[in-house]
Amino acid sequence: MAKEIILGIDLGTTNSCVAVIENKKPIVLENPEGKRTVPSVVSFNGDEVLVGDAAKRKQITNPNTISSIKRLMGTKEKVTVLNKDYTPEEISAKILTYIKEYAEKKIGAKVNKAVITVPAYFDDAQRQATKNAGIIAGLSVERIINEPTAAALAYGIDKLDKEQKILVFDLGGGTFDVSVLDMADGTFEVLSTSGDNHLGGDDWDQVIINWLLKSIADEFNIDLSKNKMAMQRLKDAAEKAKIELSGINTTTISLPFIAMDSSGQPINFEKELNRATFDNLTKNLIERLKKPVLDAMKESKLSLVDIDQVLMVGGSTRMPAVQNLVKELTGKEPNHSLNPDEVVAIGAAIQGGVLAGEIDDILLLDVTPLTLSIETMGGVATPLIPRNTKIPVSKSQIFSTAADNQPSVDIRIVQGERSLAADNKLLGNFELSGIEPAPRGVPQIEIKFNIDANGIMSVNAKDLKTQKETSITIKDSQGLSQDEIDKMIKEAEENKEKDAKVKHERELVNRADSLINQLEQVSKTENVPQEQKDVFNKQIEDLTNARDAQDYVKLEAEVKKVEDLLTNAAKFAQQAQQQNPDNQNNNKDDVTEATVTDDSTKK
């Protein structure tokens, strides 16, 4: 393991991933469930907070579950959960804390440094918010880098001697980014970026969900859109179907006991979805992928024939229709030799390795995603740092007063591509006072913009005659103070052990309640032998006693024992259904059983 450990974290909208450098090579760290990515989902239940896969299973059934919080980063919006307000930074920090803790267990050492990636289109406020989330989680964020840039690092680590023009096509769960890079002599230079902050694999899932809802409504005359349990199963089935259609031409979506009809009979739904239908349903989404690619190429001043490689990033790039579009647009076979779900975290880890001195001969040149300007006379946005300027960067320009004997100037900093300041995003403003009386246009005011390697900007204004100056560091638009950040860190640390204990106990009770309910349902099934029912009833009694006595050691043992029985119970139910496919009354009690069995297999 490297002497100084710096985590590389892909903090994604839908999923996150973490990697580190070991023996000068990046490795992806598995989460506690043995998976190499973790859902970016946080679920609250009283004092219990779940993160990752456990939270994702509650995404629809528990209204106090937060997902896609990344979309709110850098805004003033807060989410209210159980009568408490949380900032996007606090929710993101819970995800980062979870990642940090399981990474430390895998590494076997404490870690307090990280490189975190963000979409190329994240503005200054969103980048600062991401950094704040890391601080709250107990991480020193050594660098914020663009996701496509990190991907290029990952793909380019073994190709440092080849000069190439690269197009990075990054379609994740919630965002779409395109970057054009020039790679030569160990240097990555970002020539242009483009994208869509509200387009990702989740949109393809939603199309299938809508198709399923309509199919069920047409066949059974029932609307399941307000049925939380059914919607959770539809969401899971849609994602599974999308993934399967990347490898096969037809998949069968089977949803037994999805709901009850108006007469109280269970609804068993099954339907085939083929790739051609799926592609037709999502053709408008495919169409939306074209413009950002063409915009990025135009901005880079290159033609598509100049591109040497197209790098595929994000799990959604596995879809054949997406790959076909890339071939159609670029005339190149896309490179997906690395796992698209992991490549960004790998690149972040490589950047961490560079900062820690473990990897040499790589220089990362990132760019500003939008033009940075100040408002001048007439409300005009006068650019100081154009879009796609390499960072870190420092630029200055001399301005003057707009009126005679003007004693002060108000400096307003905006971000965007519009000509008028009012049409762009106001990042901040401050005043330089004490200017000596003089005719308009005579005083010389130097305005200096400085952007560090993380994309965080500071602005300085100086009267060159009096040498009076003032400055501002652009904070996120929500304006978290250092006191607020410190308070969040303190609260997280003070409640760390308590939260872990409560979480474990609540998980046990929830699992026990679910198992008790399932065994009770199976016991009512006529096809289950009486001796098996007696075993189930004894287990129900043991689970109930341990739960009510709050004997969590015993409860954990009983839960593990019953989960083995649960597998057999599911087999009994399946056999009963196969033997009596038309006997709806006999299967009525299986509605709960089927649902609980699906949940338990995920635990």
UniProtKB/Swiss-Prot annotation:
In which residue ranges is the amino acid composition biased (Low complexity)? Answer: 573-586
Gene3D superfamilies to which the protein is assigned, alphabetical: 3.30.420.40, Actin, Chain A, domain 4, Substrate Binding Domain Of DNAk, Chain A, domain 1
Q: Where is the signal peptide?
A: none
Sorted alphabetically, the keyword list is: ATP-binding, Chaperone, Nucleotide-binding, Phosphoprotein, Stress response
InterPro entries, alphabetized: ATPase_NBD, Chaperone_DnaK, Heat_shock_70_CS, HSP70_peptide-bd_sf, Hsp_70_fam
Record-listed Phosphothreonine modification sites:
175
Extract one GO molecular function annotation from the record: ATP-dependent protein folding chaperone
Q: In this record, what's one Pfam family?
A: HSP70
In residue numbers, the region (Disordered) covers: 573-603
Keyword Secreted set for record: no
Database matches in SUPFAM superfamilies: Actin-like ATPase domain, Heat shock protein 70kD (HSP70), peptide-binding domain
Biased-composition ranges for Polar residues?
Answer: 594-603
Q: Induced by what?
A: By stress conditions e.g. heat shock.
General function of this protein: Acts as a chaperone.
| Family in the record | Belongs to the heat shock protein 70 family.
> What's this protein's name?
Chaperone protein DnaK
Species source reads Ureaplasma parvum serovar 3 (strain ATCC 700970)
Q: Which gene encodes it?
A: dnaK
